[in-house]
C-alpha cells in the first residue's frame, strides 16, 4: 500500500485471511501460515467454528458461504447474524492488529464493494484497535488483490531462483 511500510491486508471471501506487511515486505512466518486469522481461537473455538454457529459457513465449516453472508448486508444489515459476524470479524482483525501494530488495515475481498459492510466492519473493528490512529481502508485492487499478490510473489520467487543459479 502506497505510503505505508507496515500494514495488514485482510481478505474476506470464501475464507478469511490476512497478509502482514512489515518494513515493506510480506511476512509469511516460518511455516508460511502467518495471517491465518480464521484459526485464531477464543474460548477454545476458532473464528470459523464461531461463524459456523451463525449459519454462514458451508456444511463442514471450512469456508464461508458467500450467499449466506452477503444477504444480511444487502437485505437486513442490522440483523443479528450480520451484527454477530461483524463483531467476531472485528475482534479477530483487532487482535491481529494488536500483535503487529500496523499503520493501516486494508480490507479486501468480495464484500468490499458493499459500502454497508465496509462501514459496519470499520465500526466493529475500531473499538478493538489499541492505536486509534490506525487507518482502516479498502484495497485499491478490490477483489483482485490476492491474485496480484500471488502473481508478484511467483515472479519474485522465479527471479530469485534465476539469480541463485546465475551466482553458482
List PLM regions with ranges.
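ATP-binding/phosphotransfer module of carbohydrate and carboxylate kinases, centering on a glycine-rich
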Residues: 1-3, 42-168
Amino acid at each position: 500500500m502506497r505510503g505505508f511500510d507496515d500494514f495488514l491486508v485482510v481478505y474476506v471471501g470464501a475464507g478469511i485471511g490476512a497478509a502482514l506487511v512489515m518494513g515493506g515486505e510480506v511476512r509469511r512466518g516460518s511455516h508460511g501460515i502467518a495471517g491465518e486469522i480464521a484459526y485464531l481461537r477464543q474460548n477454545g473455538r476458532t473464528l470459523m467454528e464461531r461463524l459456523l454457529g451463525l449459519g454462514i459457513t458451508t456444511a463442514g465449516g471450512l469456508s464461508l458461504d458467500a450467499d449466506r453472508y452477503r444477504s444480511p448486508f444487502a437485505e437486513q444489515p442490522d440483523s443479528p447474524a450480520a451484527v454477530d459476524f461483524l463483531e467476531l470479524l472485528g475482534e479477530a482483525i483487532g487482535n491481529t492488529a494488536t500483535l503487529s501494530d500496523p499503520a493501516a488495515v486494508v480490507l479486501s475481498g468480495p464484500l468490499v464493494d458493499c459500502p454497508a459492510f465496509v462501514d459496519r466492519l470499520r465500526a466493529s473493528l475500531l473499538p478493538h484497535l489499541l492505536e486509534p490512529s490506525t487507518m482502516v481502508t479498502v484495497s485499491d485492487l478490490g477483489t483482485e488483490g490476492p491474485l496480484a499478490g500471488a502473481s508478484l510473489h511467483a515472479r519474485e520467487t522465479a527471479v530469485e531462483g534465476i539469480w541463485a543459479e546465475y551466482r553458482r
